[in-house]
Curated annotation (Swiss-Prot):
Name of the protein: Probable endonuclease 4
Coiled coil: none
Binding positions (Zn(2+) 3): 182, 227, 229
EC number: 3.1.21.2
Entry's family note: Belongs to the AP endonuclease 2 family.
GO molecular function: deoxyribonuclease IV (phage-T4-induced) activity; DNA binding; DNA-(apurinic or apyrimidinic site) endonuclease activity; phosphoric diester hydrolase activity; zinc ion binding
UniProt keyword annotation of Metal-binding present: yes
Alphabetical list of CDD domains matching this protein: AP2Ec
Amino acid sequence: MLKIGSHVGMSGKEAFFGSAKEAHSYDANTFMVYTGAPQNTRRKDISDLRLEEGFEFMKQHGISDIVIHAPYIINLGNSVNLDTYSLAVDFLAKEMERTKAFRSKYLVLHPGAHVGAGVDAGIKQIVQGLNEVLTRDTDLYIALETMAGKGSEIGRNFEELARIYDGVKYNDRLRVCFDTCHTNDAGYDVVNDFDGVIEQFDKLIGKEQIAVFHINDSKNDRGASKDRHENIGFGTLGFDAISYIVHHSDFIEVPKILETPYVSLPNEKEKSLPPYRYEIEMLRNSVFDPQILEKIQNNR
């Protein structure tokens, strides 16, 4: 069965219970959430997040295999500022514990950035950090995200991810989150030759290592290294290419998570609406609706 959902929020009094309800409102059967704000280390206590109510709601509505995303501030690749690196390692370990509390198997992580020290130094530092947090007994997977190649990001190509795998002692606890926008922006031809791209990935890492897909169109041409997401069917990837990926027989059981932009209202630019219910429906049915953005704006 196709597993498809989106990023959802987690805030206010309903907390995770509200996250599950938001996912259900999009007719999703999976979703992704941050355990707190992605830009900082402030976190509510697990006991305040209404997890059990969320789990019960998920059970009642056929939602499973949720994904946790690590915050952006974790940069394991920083060998220039070791205080930043130490913070990243410590906070990643805490996020792993929170991921288990959310009953998720997958913690998606941006591998890191070398901040000018060079790719080799960045990869060495990432490997060191992962070796500090992963043990024989780790009972979840860290899913390294494919990156667009913006700035000094590590993970802009499969070779860099493979080098991380090669250096990590307990790399059976690693997986990959394949982002369609990022791989396009990094230079891979996921539009015309997705199977060829996967063949490259399979030779270097193994396609069975892909545990999560981030499903996004892109505002950029292939190889732009910019990482700007677009709504499904309105970017340079196009609906047909994305639908092909979503329904690919090799990955039908892998959770597909939408991270596409909210849709702005024409006369109220400060307000925007989530597109996920509409995009999920389009992708489930494999039928593109070119009027979908207008429908989102009119059905608020």
